[in-house]
UniProtKB/Swiss-Prot annotation:
Known uses: Could be used to improve the production of 2,3-butanediol, a valuable chemical for industrial applications, in Z.mobilis cells.
pH dependence of function: Optimum pH is 8.0 for meso-2,3-butanediol oxidation. Optimum pH is 5.0 for (3S/3R)-acetoin reduction and 8.0 for diacetyl reduction.
Record keywords, A-Z: NAD, Oxidoreductase
Role, per record: Catalyzes the NAD-dependent oxidation of meso-2,3-butanediol to (3R)-acetoin, and of (2S,3S)-2,3-butanediol to (3S)-acetoin, with much lower efficiency. Can also oxidize several primary alcohols such as glycerol, 1-2-pentanediol and 1,2-propanediol, with lower activity. Cannot use (2R,3R)-2,3-butanediol. In the presence of NADH, catalyzes the reduction of (3R)-acetoin to meso-2,3-butanediol, of (3S)-acetoin to (2S,3S)-2,3-butanediol and of diacetyl to (3S)-acetoin. No activity is detected with NADPH/NADP(+).
Binding, (S)-acetoin: S138, Y151
Protein's recorded name: Meso-2,3-butanediol dehydrogenase
Domain writeup: The substrate-binding pocket is formed by two protein molecules. When compared to other Bdh enzymes, SmBdh contains a shorter alpha6 helix, which provides more efficient entry and exit of molecules from the active site, thereby contributing to enhanced substrate turnover.
Regulation: Oxidation of meso-2,3-butanediol is enhanced in the presence of Fe(2+). Reduction of diacetyl and (3S/3R)-acetoin is slightly enhanced in the presence of Mg(2+) and Mn(2+). Activity is inhibited by several metal ions, particularly Fe(3+) for reduction of diacetyl and acetoin.
Binding-site list for (R)-acetoin: S138, S140, Y151
Lineage: Bacteria, Pseudomonadati, Pseudomonadota, Gammaproteobacteria, Enterobacterales
Signal peptide: none
Temperature dependence: Optimum temperature is 40 degrees Celsius for oxidation and reduction reactions.
Cited Pfam families: adh_short_C2
Active site positions: Y151
Amino acid sequence: MRFDNKVVVITGAGNGMGEAAARRFSAEGAIVVLADWAKEAVDKVAASLPKGRAMAVHIDVSDHVAVEKMMNEVAEKLGRIDVLLNNAGVHVAGSVLETSIDDWRRIAGVDIDGVVFCSKFALPHLLKTKGCIVNTASVSGLGGDWGAAYYCAAKGAVVNLTRAMALDHGGDGVRINSVCPSLVKTNMTNGWPQEIRDKFNERIALGRAAEPEEVAAVMAFLASDDASFINGANIPVDGGATASDGQPKIV
C-alpha cells in the first residue's frame, strides 16, 4: 500500500473532502491524524476508522500556538509526520463592500493563516521524513468569481504560497502541491437551491459537481511516490471548468 504506516495529518477532516481524504489515506495503510474545530464530527470520523490507526484532534487552525503544539505532539506520539493535508477552509459570500472586516478576518484566519501555521510547524518534521504537503486551494484561486472576493483572495494566496514553498523546500526533499476543486458535493453545497447548482454545472464540461472521493483521489496521488517529480503544481480538479476561456456556450 502506498502509505503503509505513514503518518498523515489532515485538517478539516470532520466532513466533506477532508473526511473523504481520511478514508482514502486510511484505506491505503496510513495512520491518520484528523484535525477539525468540530469535535463531535471529527471524533465520529476517527471512530469509524480502524482502531489504533486514527487520532482526532479538536483544534482551531488559526491559533498558531495550538497548531505548533499539535504538530509536536503528533510527532512525539507517532514518531514522525509524512504528509500534511491543509484542507480546512471557510467561505463567506459577498463583495468587498457587502462583507465585513470580521468576515475577512475569519476567512483569512482559516484559509490563509491555517495553511501557513500548519505548514510552518509541520515542516521541521517533514524535512526529516522527506515528506510532502498537499494544500486544498480552489479554482477560485486560479481566477475570480462574482460575489466571493475574500474567498478568491484567500485561495489565490494558497495557490501562490504553494509555488513559493515548493521552491523553498523542494531542494530539501519536501514536495508541496495543491488541488484546485470546482464545485464539490458537500454538506454545504448539497443544501444550495437546485437552480444555483445548475448554474455551476453549466460551467463544468462534465456537467456535474465532484464527489469528495474524486478530489481525495488526487490528494492521495499528489502525496504518493507516484507523484515524486511533481512539485509546485496547482492541479484543477474541476471537470473541465477551467478549460473554458469564459465565453458562453452557444452551440
